Amino acid sequence: MKKLVLSIIAGLALMLGLTNVVQADEYLRIGMEAAYAPFNWTQDDDSNGAVKIDGTNQYANGYDVQIAKKIAKDLGKEPLVVKTKWEGLVPALTSGKIDMIIAGMSPTAERKQEIAFSSSYYTSEPVLLVKKDSAYANAKTLDDFKDAKITSQQGVYLYDLISQIPGAKKETAMGDF
């Protein structure tokens, strides 16, 4: 009797395990913050081509989401967004929780040691944003930012660039704005 029960349990475990593999294969799990418009954001419905966010009643949309849909379609899979904090994206990928990151992540040397990058689908140049009426509104060169308090988003390569601005005061990186 004990062997029969163990056999049934083992069989069920095997079937459940295979079910998870089949389910995992039908989806392309894409990691992104879903909080960085216009690239990706969270919304309450599937309007305008939004994609379901795993484990929630919400949907993600934006430029990154549309790219994800195209890639998933080309692979014959359904896209599924896995909403992940920025600092958790690389660990989620390396652990297998997600299949890919689509989040405007720059291919830094440090990141390239852990993960592979595709060709860029979007490029941009770093810029400094200032208030219209600030003392730096008419700045033309980096030297014009002497004594300016400057920061960036936490965990992005732009934060390291601040030290290249002569005389700027590098503030603590921001988790959100």
Which residues make up each language-model segment?
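Bacterial N-terminal signal peptides
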Residues: S7-G17
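Bilobed "Venus flytrap"/periplasmic-binding protein-like clamshell domains
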Residues: A34-A37, N57-K73, V127-F177
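Extracytoplasmic small-molecule ligand-binding "clamshell" domains
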Residues: D25-G104
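Positively charged n-region of N-terminal signal peptides that target proteins for export
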Residues: M1-V5
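Sec/Tat signal peptide C-region and signal peptidase I cleavage site
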Residues: L18-A24
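Short glycine-/acidic-enriched loop or helix-start segments at secondary-structure transitions
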Residues: N40-T42, K112-Q113, L161-I162
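Short capping/connector residues at structural and topological boundaries
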Residues: W41-D44, S120-Y122, P126, I150
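Acidic, polar ligand-binding/catalytic clefts
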Residues: E78-D144, G155
